[in-house]
A protein has these predicted regions:
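Conserved P-loop
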Residues: 8-89, 128-139, 152, 176
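Helix C-cap/helix->beta junction micro-motif
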Residues: 45, 116-117
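Conserved ATPase-coupling elements of RecA-like P-loop NTPase cores
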Residues: 98-113, 127-134
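Short, Lys/Arg-enriched N-terminal segments with co-localized hydrophobic residues
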Residues: 1-6
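Catalytic-core regions built around general acid/base machinery
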Residues: 38, 109-116, 136-143
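Structural recognition of the conserved hydrophobic beta-strand(s) that form the central parallel beta-sheet
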Residues: 119-126
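Walker B beta-strand of ABC/ABC-like P-loop ATPase nucleotide-binding domains
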Residues: 94-95
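Conserved GTP-binding G-domain of TRAFAC-class P-loop NTPases and closely related GTPase folds
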Residues: 139-179
Length: 179
C-alpha cells in the first residue's frame, strides 16, 4: 500500500516492492504529460528508467514520447507488450505510453514486472471515441495499485471533459493523430 495525492507521487511503504500505476483519460487530457513528469522525477532520483511506446504511435517522433504540449522524453518503440519485458530487466521504473495499443498481453507483462519489484507506470485511453472500454486498459485498472484519471477541457463550453470526441468519420476504432 501507500498514499496517493493527485498532486504528488504515489509512495510505497515497503522498499523494493513493485507497483502498477495507471494514468487514464480522454485525448488531450494530459496523460502523457503526467507520465513524463513522473518519469523525469524518477530520473532525478537516479533511478534506472526504461520508457516504451507502441510502434503505431509515430505522431511526433519514433524515438521519444511527446505530449501535445511538446514535452518529450526518449523512448523505445515496441510492437507488443512482450517486447517491453525483453528490454526492462535493468530498469527500476518502467514507463509505457499509449498502453491501449500494446494488446491483451500488457496486463500479464505489468504484473510480472511489478512482481520483480519494479514500478510500472502506464498511460493510455480507457475508452474509445464511442465511450466503450478500450482493452486492455480496463483490466489494467482492475489490478493497479494507483490510478490517476485525467480530464480534458471541452473546447466548446470550457467544462471538464472525460470523453474523446472524434471529428472525422473515417477509419475504424483506431485513427492515430489528433482527430
Amino acid at each position: 500500500g501507500g498514499a496517493c495525492d493527485p498532486m504528488s507521487e504515489p509512495t510505497r511503504t515497503l522498499p523494493g516492492t513493485g507497483s502498477i500505476e495507471v494514468i487514464v483519460g480522454s485525448m488531450y487530457s494530459g496523460k502523457t504529460e503526467e507520465l513524463i513528469r513522473r518519469l523525469r522525477r524518477a530520473q532525478i532520483a537516479r533511478q534506472r528508467v526504461e520508457i516504451f511506446k507502441p510502434t503505431l504511435d509515430d505522431r511526433y517522433a519514433k524515438d521519444a514520447i511527446v505530449s501535445h504540449s511538446e514535452l518529450r522524453i526518449p523512448s523505445r518503440s515496441v510492437k507488443n507488450a512482450a517486447e517491453v519485458l525483453k528490454h526492462a530487466h535493468e530498469a527500476q521504473v518502467i514507463g509505457i505510453d499509449e498502453g491501449q495499443f500494446l494488446g491483451a498481453g500488457l496486463v500479464d507483462v505489468c504484473e510480472k514486472l511489478a512482481r520483480m519489484g519494479k514500478r510500472v507506470i502506464v498511460a493510455g485511453l480507457d475508452q474509445d471515441y464511442r465511450a466503450r472500454p478500450f482493452e486492455p486498459m480496463p483490466q489494467l485498472l482492475a489490478i493497479a495499485e494507483y490510478i490517476t484519471n485525467t480530464l480534458a477541457i471541452c473546447v466548446v463550453c470550457g467544462a471538464p471533459a472525460n470523453r474523446t470526441y472524434r471529428k472525422v468519420q473515417r477509419g475504424g476504432r483506431v485513427v492515430v493523430g489528433g482527430t
